[in-house]
Every structure is written in C-alpha cells, then in structure tokens.
Amino acid sequence: MRAGSLVLFFNWRLGLGVQIILLWIMISPAAVALVGKPLQDLSTAEMLVLNDDLTLARRYLHPSIYSPHISSKLRSRFYYVKGYTFMKEGLHVSAGKELYRALEFDASNPDALYCLGQLYYHGRGYDEDVQMGLSFFREAADFSHQDAKFYLAYSLLIGKGTEQNEEKGLSALSDLVADGHVEAMMHLANHYRKTGYDQDRENFDRIKELYERALKAGSPEAALSLGVLYKEGKLVAKDLGLAFQYFTLASDMGSLQADVHIAHSLAAGLGIKRDYVAARRHYLEAADNDLAGGFLGLGYLYEFGLGVQIDLVKARAFYDLGAGTSSSALNEN
C-alpha cells in the first residue's frame, strides 16, 4: 500500500494525533513499515469494539501499544481504546487505569477525559465523586467533546454536583440539540413531558418533534417514547395501532424495554389482534433481559391461564422475580 492511500484509508477513522502521524508517513514513505502495522491494529481494534468483540480488540492493541515508533498522541489513543473495552465490560477499575495511562501520553485526550468523568460521576470503579467527574467533563468540553457538554448541561438542569440552574441547563441542552446531539434531544423532550401535561400546544409539538428528530438520528428510545405518546393519547391523538408500530420499530432497533410494551399490547389487544402466545414470547424476551415487566407479565399469564395452563406456582415465582428487579419497562417512558 502506498503512503498516500494509507492516509486516505485511515484519515476518516482516527483522531488528530493519528492524522499528524499519517502526514509524516506521506512525507517519509520509509516510515510506513514502522507505523503502518500499529495503525492497522488500532483501526481493527476499533472496528472490533463496535462489534462488541472486546477481548479480541485488546489482542490487536498488543504489542503495537508499546511500539517505539508511534507518537505520544497515538499511544494515548491505544490506551483509551483499551480502557474503553474494559468500560464496556463493566471492569471499571481496569478501565480507569488504562484511561489514566492515556492521559500520561496526551493530557488533552478528550475521550479519555470524558470516560474518566463518567467513572467518577457515577461511582464506577472509584468512590462516587461528582465534582471530580464534572472537572473531567469540563476539560473534555474545552476540547469540544459533545457528550461531556451534555453531562454539564444535564447537571445544571437537575443540580447534580453544581447549583441547579434550570434555565442555563435547558439553554445548554438546546444548543446541543441544534448540533444534532441525540441524548440532548431525548432529555429535553423527557424534561418537558415530566413538567406536566398542562402545557400549551407549542410545547406538545416540540416534544413530538424532538422525539422524531432523535428517531431519525437512530435512537430506539425515541421510537419507544413515541409509542408511549400515541398509547397514552395525552400529547397527541391516541392511536393504538401507530403506538404498536413504534414499539415494534423500537424493538427492531435494539430497545429491550420495547418487548414489554409489545407483549402488553398483544395480551390486551391494543392496536393489534389479541395473541397470548405471541405476548408470552415477548414477555420471555423481556424477562431474559431482567426487566420487571417481563416477569410480571408472565406471572399474569400463568395466574389467569392466558395462552398457557393455569399454574399458580409459576405465577407466584414470576411475580417474585419481578418484585426483585428494579426495572419496569412500562414505567420508564
């Protein structure tokens, strides 16, 4: 592969530090043999992370992470990706160690700063320290990290770790929405919903518009929320058929909570023909993901013999499992 084509291949995928290295490669083709392999390994590792193949991703990071021929910025990226794989696995102590290593080689690595902010803000791997988390978010935001800006805006809105300032929080979220930030769209819409339904029509339309924008950007939670809106009929005209379509779309997009809504609609015949067998299948999917609504729905089916033989022992067991979980899809949207 020629040096110029190597630049074109990697430039879309990696950050500023990598681009600097690649520019050096263009100037010095002999350097390709020294740097090309680490870059290929890093790109492969990042693609594996997107596919949740985290152990294999870490294998590709070694031994290139120790190569003497890469820049400090590129080495920082290696450590960040390694730390991120541990975060995705819930191994937060290991994640923190790698993220701090990333900052040793590049103190301005915004992704590493942001992830460390998350660990402290939520108390994962470290004792919860919201102030420390916010300090990392501020540093990352200084480098235009949009997710870090979101956390700062959200903290202002709810007063977590800082003095509550709803006006500034909403303004900051609105700025992020203008930049296309999906989580900001969702939280802004949810905030307006939670402030009550005695608002004017303009706010109703804005809530719906925010969810629709988030859905176009690929948010399964937005599809789920739109389904709930049409099921409730409080902000829009009730349309149970359309609600079921949104629940199905949310499930297809990866929403685990959508299965409970689909199952409930099937069991009650809401917007779809009543089908207890199909309802049971979706309740089982939800239960497999430890959602309380899945267990409770199964308990209901077995208690009253809906699509199954009455079995009060099984019903009680499912009710107990549901009571022992903290999540309930029907109450989260």
Q: Across the structure, where does each feature detected by a protein language model lie?
A:
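N-terminal leader/linker segments that initiate helical-solenoid repeat arrays
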Residues: 27-84, 324, 328, 333
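Short helix-capping/linker turns of helical repeat alpha-solenoids
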Residues: 67-68, 72-74, 106-108, 122-124, ...
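Hydrophobic face of amphipathic alpha-helices that form TPR/SEL1-like repeat modules
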Residues: 63-64, 81-86, 113, 117-122, ...
